[in-house]
Design a protein with these regions (language model features):
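A Rossmann-like FAD-binding core segment of flavoenzymes
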Residues: 2-21, 26-29, 90-168
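Residue-level detector of short coil/turn "hinge" positions at structural boundaries
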Residues: 1-2, 40
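Portal/gating segments that form or line small-molecule/metal binding sites
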Residues: 32
Length: 168
């Protein structure tokens, strides 16, 4: 059987295992598969939270097709960000990859794919300052980490790709 319920306790000292659920129910099982999942890690900006589902996404494969023919921005510098940026080139007319450092942390193979893709522009040494818009995202303000200068990108889509937090 499969239960979609929060398990709050497990007693592994006896068989069958005893599980306690948040609802107060208890279960027994001969074996257990823990599939806790993970959630996208967010930047923590108020404007980011305001626009989740309205142009801000933590899942390029889920939401990329909404931005067919449009310019989008991916925030991050690791493998997840590189993979998201490359995936988004299937839909977007241009993909800006924004990273706070002067080099990406992604693997060499992914970095080479990014550098040779004409749809990708990497913006180094910038951090998101504010995501702007009214009902939906219209752009993102990026701050240069060395000079403090602010640059604006007009875009309806901002993908946050800075990792995931395990749901444990």
């Amino acid at each position: 059987a499969v239960f979609n319920e929060e398990i709050t306790s497990v007693d592994f000292t006896q068989r069958p295992f005893r599980l306690g659920a948040g609802s107060g129910k208890s279960y027994t099982a001969g074996s257990i598969i823990a599939a806790t999942g993970a959630q996208a890690r967010w930047l923590g900006m108020p404007s980011e939270q305001k626009f989740i589902g309205k142009g801000v996404s933590g899942c390029a494969t889920c939401d990329g097709f909404f931005f067919r023919g449009k310019e989008v921005c991916v925030v991050g510098g690791g493998d997840s960000a590189a993979e998201d940026a490359l995936f988004l080139t299937k839909f977007a007319s241009r993909v800006y990859l924004v990273h706070r450092r002067d080099a990406l942390r992604a693997t060499f193979r992914l970095v080479e794919k990014l550098r040779t893709n004409p749809k990708v522009e990497i913006i180094f040494e910038h951090t998101p300052e504010e995501i702007t818009g009214e009902a939906k995202v219209t752009g993102i303000n990026l701050k240069n980490v060395k000079t403090g200068a602010v640059r604006r990108l007009e875009t309806p889509g901002v993908f946050i790709a800075i990792g995931h937090t395990p749901a444990t």
